[in-house]
Design a protein with these regions (language model features):
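Loop/turn-to-beta-strand initiation segments
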Residues: 61-66, 91-97
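AAA+/P-loop NTPase substrate/partner-engagement loops
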Residues: 39-53, 104-106
């Protein structure tokens, strides 16, 4: 992580954008950045992006040196535009650290006004070294970062693989009500005995595209596009289970 901050550790930019896949170490890098300056306090404001908050005295005229962090991948375009308020006449006491899973998640106006750090992709052999479960081949097909590997190590990947395989190969004959029960197997909020939502999306995406390359089936392509849309929308809403069930409904219809 040190290589990413070598050029800025003597003069910390007021806005830093860190881009990297989930589990790539964005927050570890953020913690290192926070050690570079004597901040009075740090605050995650991802869930507080409103005009009222951004115009508040606390933000516009801070009396302490503060670091605000924001996950742009969880913000709508409208919220990102609101965030630009902080770039107009920034206080010398205010610092921003912005996270994004990909460049596509970030408005160009934010990107150009920030110091950009893009975390390199991890080599396959480096990831393989981190795997402690017996499902090495399956994990390496869907996990690209140490954080994803960590979750996979504590997941029954064989069972997840089988569930996603059934969603691809047997959805044509599946009963609608049975299809909806898939949502009961996904962790939407601290239900760690269930499948991680992001890992599920990665696995189903892998299975859909593998099958599509073999069959060129249009229904598989439609189902994959529905999954991509889910991955864009679900991180922006509070009621993730409801959003997921809407996806299952559209996914089921794609095979009809």
């Amino acid at each position: 992580m040190d290589k990413y901050i070598e050029n800025i550790k003597e003069d910390l930019p007021h806005s830093i954008l860190i881009i990297g896949e989930r589990g790539s170490g964005k927050h570890k890098l953020y913690n290192k950045l926070c050690e570079l300056k004597n901040f009075n306090y740090t605050m995650d404001i991802t869930d507080r992006i409103t005009k009222e908050f951004l115009n508040s005295e606390e933000i516009q005229n801070p009396v302490n040196i503060i670091m605000l962090s924001v996950d742009l991948s969880k913000l709508t375009v409208r919220q990102q535009n609101m965030l630009l308020k902080l770039f107009e006449e920034p206080s010398k006491y205010l610092y921003l650290c912005l996270f994004a899973d990909s460049e596509a998640d970030v408005l160009e106006t934010i990107k150009t006004r920030s110091y950009n750090i893009v975390i390199d992709k991890y080599a396959r052999d480096a990831l393989e070294y981190l795997i402690t479960s017996n499902n090495k081949n399956i994990i390496l097909e869907v996990c690209n970062t140490p954080g994803q590997i960590e979750i996979a190590n504590h997941t029954d990947m064989e069972a997840l693989y089988k569930m996603c395989e059934n969603m691809v190969k047997k959805m044509r004959v599946a009963n609608y009500q049975n299809a909806l029960t898939i949502s009961n197997k996904i962790n939407f909020s601290d239900e760690y005995d269930k499948y991680d939502l992001f890992l599920f999306i990665k696995m189903l995406s892998y299975k859909l595209m593998t099958e599509f390359y073999e069959t060129q089936s249009k229904e598989l392509l439609y189902a994959y596009l529905e999954l991509k849309e889910l991955n864009k929308r679900i991180w922006l809403v509070n009621n993730k289970k409801q959003q997921f069930e809407r996806f299952i409904s559209r996914y089921w219809k794609a095979f009809r």
